[in-house]
Amino acid sequence: MEEISLKWRQHSVRGIFFLAGLAGATWAPMVPIVKQRLGITDDIMGMLLLCIGIGSMFSMPLTGAMAKKYGCRKVITVASILMIGILFGLSQVNSVYMVAAFLLLFGSAIGMLDVTMNINAVLVEKISPRSIMSNYHGMWSTGCFVGAGLFALCLSNGLSVTNATCISLLIMAAIIAIFSGKLLEYGDDSNSEEKAPLIAIPKGIVVFFSIVTGISFLVEGAVMDWSGIFITEVHNMDIALAGTGYSIYSAAMLLCRFGGDAAVRRLGRKTVALGGMVISCLGFLLLILSPWEVGTFASFFIMGIGLANVVPVVFSIMGKQKDMPSAQAIAAVSTVGYMGVLGGPAAIGFISNATSLNIAFGIIAILIVIQTLITRYVFKKMN
C-alpha cells in the first residue's frame, strides 16, 4: 500500500471518530429541549433515553458479521447517513412514541458505527508502522467538544433547534463525502472464507478484556451521570459547579488520548493500561476522601488521565489476539462495554439509595482494583 494511501486511510478513521463524537454531542443538548417540547416527567424521559441503549445492544453483537460481509466502508456510511436523518427527525417530532422509535434507531445506528469504526481503526493500525489508536479516540473526544460547543453557540445566538441541528448535520455530511471513500472495503483481515457467526460471543482472552472494557465504560458512565450529584450533595458545592467535574475529567481524557500513542510506544501497552488503572483508582479515592474543593476537582483530572487510554489499548490488542477474528472480538468487547454504561449508573443509584454515594463510589474503586488484577493476569498469560 502506498504511503499516501495509508495516510488517507488514517485520516478517514480520524474523520469518522470525530463524526461519531459530533453526533453524540448533537443529541445531548437536545435532551432537555425534547423533554420540554413533549411536556413529560423525568421518569418518562429516562425510559426514552433507555431506548438508545436498547437499540445499541441490539445492533452491536450483529455488527461484526455485517462488517465482514459488507466491509467497513458500507456499514459506516450507512450508519452515518442513518444518524443524519434520525437526528434531524429528533429535532422535529412531537410525539413520545415517535421519539422512542427514533431513539431506538439512533441507538442502533450509533452501535453499528461504534463497532465498525473501531474495527476499521484496528485494521488500519495493523498496516501502520506505529500505534495510533489513542489518537483516533482523541478525535472522538474532540468531536464531542466541538459538537457541544457549536450547538450551544448556535442557540445562544438565537438560532432555532432545527437550524443548530442542521449545521451539525451538514458537517457530518461533509465528513462522509470526504472520507467514506477512503475507508477500508473489507471488515476482517483473516483469509478465512468461513461465515462469521451472527452474534459475537467473547472467547479466550477476549472474555477477560470484555470485562476490563465493561468496567471502564461503567466508570465513565458513573462519572458522567453522578459526578454532578456527588459534587453538590456529598461535597455541598454550589449547583453552578455541578458540571465542572465532568468537564475537567473530559479535558484530561482528551489531552491524554492525543499523547497516548507516544506513551504506548515508549512504555508499552501493559504499562499504559495498568498504570492508567492505578491512577484512576487513586483519583476515586481522592474524590471520596478529600475535604477540599481543589482536591475534588483534582480527583476528576486524575481520573481522566488514568482512564484515557485503557479502552484504546484494549481495542488495539483485539486486533492482535488470535482467539477470535478482529471484527468479532471488537463487537463482543463493545457490547459488554455498553452493558457497563447502561447498568453501572443505575446500580450506583440503587447502592447509593441503600447506603451512600460515598460507598457506591468506593465500590467503583474496588472494581478498578479487580480490573487491574484481571489485566495483569491476561498480559502475563499473553506473554
Describe each region flagged by the PLM.
Residues 39, 71, 92-97, 236, ...:
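Helix-breaking motifs and short loop linkers at transmembrane-helix boundaries and internal kinks
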Residues 27-28, 202-247, 251:
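Extracytoplasmic gate region of multi-pass secondary transporters
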